[in-house]
């Protein structure tokens, strides 16, 4: 599949629904009447104070399965600890409307980062989460923008961590977080600070599929390098990726790693392991990659460094 889809530049929109569409949100909820009661003057004040002191506006990178994720990882790795203090700074009285709009977008970005951090904790301890919890613990004065914030956070959990946010009680707005495609590779995370790795595993399985179910090792590393994952280099989420692919996932039977018959010097290749065959299917992996390829990390690309900041503060 093509990895060279190009993303348009994102433009601010006054309409909330249109704004959500511009952000590429999927499955966002409609705001309730109670949420819409927040006055525009109160919102404006909170938005200006929360978002003041933001860095330069984000750029619109190219989209695509591997290239989209590479944008997330690259920007995440550039996290600036100073960004966490933005909410305490006061805006200048001479800020023009365009700058105020940008600062508001940055304020929403910070809320998305906070919500991702909150959802990660719920996923690790295997607890459900309700809309009421999210509003009280994270969203707070931004209740009218819950659909945008929740939609973007859910997308982040799915694309970066391979974790689906599923509604289990529509009446009570209750959700559970589960590993994508029925995989159990993240079942032992516990209440620590380990990051879910299912998304990376799914991409590796997908690369194997594109090579007639048997991918040379160098092809795997070339594909992962587009995402900022390099052999022998410690990764912020996955640790040392070579160990993860050639030892951990091999021992768990998600991957098979073997020498190419007759190769001299020795070359190695990856295949699906028995557990991958048991827990998921070719069709599910292909559909997941199609979903990744449709994502466009536009408008809030620097969100991902903010989420890392939330994680670092929690350590």
Swiss-Prot record:
Q: Which UniProt keywords apply?
A: Tumor antigen
Under Pfam families, the record lists: MAGE, MAGE_N
Tissue spec. comment: Expressed in many tumors of several types, such as melanoma, head and neck squamous cell carcinoma, lung carcinoma and breast carcinoma, but not in normal tissues except for testes and placenta.
Domain MAGE: residue ranges? 108-307
- Biased composition (Basic and acidic residues) is annotated at 1-13
Tell me the GO molecular function terms.
histone deacetylase binding
Q: Sum up the protein's function in the record's words.
A: Not known, though may play a role in embryonal development and tumor transformation or aspects of tumor progression.
Query: Protein name, please?
Result: Melanoma-associated antigen 9
């Amino acid at each position: 599949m093509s990895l060279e889809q190009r993303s348009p530049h994102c433009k601010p929109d006054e309409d909330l629904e249109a704004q959500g569409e511009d952000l590429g949100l999927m499955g966002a909820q409609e705001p309730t009447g109670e949420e819409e009661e927040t006055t525009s003057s109160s919102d404006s004040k909170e938005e200006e104070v929360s978002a003041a002191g933001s860095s330069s506006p984000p750029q619109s990178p190219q989209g695509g399965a591997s290239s989209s994720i590479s944008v997330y990882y690259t920007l995440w790795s550039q996290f600036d600890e100073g960004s966490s203090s933005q909410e305490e700074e006061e805006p200048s009285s001479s800020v023009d409307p365009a700058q105020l709009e940008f600062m508001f977008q940055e304020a929403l970005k910070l809320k998305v980062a906070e919500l991702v951090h909150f959802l990660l904790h719920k996923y690790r301890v295997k607890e459900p989460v309700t809309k009421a919890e999210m509003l009280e613990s994270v969203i707070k004065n931004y209740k009218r923008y819950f659909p945008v914030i929740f939609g973007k956070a859910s997308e982040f959990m799915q694309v970066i961590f391979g974790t689906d946010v599923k509604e289990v009680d529509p009446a009570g707005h209750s959700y559970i977080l589960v590993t994508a495609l029925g995989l159990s590779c993240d079942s032992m995370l516990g209440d620590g600070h380990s990051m879910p790795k299912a998304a990376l595993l799914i991409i590796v399985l997908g690369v194997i599929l594109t090579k007639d179910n048997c991918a040379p090792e160098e092809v795997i590393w070339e594909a992962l390098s587009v995402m900022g994952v390099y052999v022998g280099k410690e990764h912020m989420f996955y640790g040392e990726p070579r160990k993860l692919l050639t030892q951990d996932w091999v021992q768990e039977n998600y991957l098979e790693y073997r020498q190419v018959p007759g190769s001299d010097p020795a070359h190695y290749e990856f295949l699906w392991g028995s557990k991958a065959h048991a827990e998921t299917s070719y069709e599910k992996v292909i559909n997941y990659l199609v979903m990744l390829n449709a994502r466009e990390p536009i408008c809030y690309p620097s969100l991902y460094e903010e989420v890392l900041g939330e994680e670092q503060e929690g350590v």
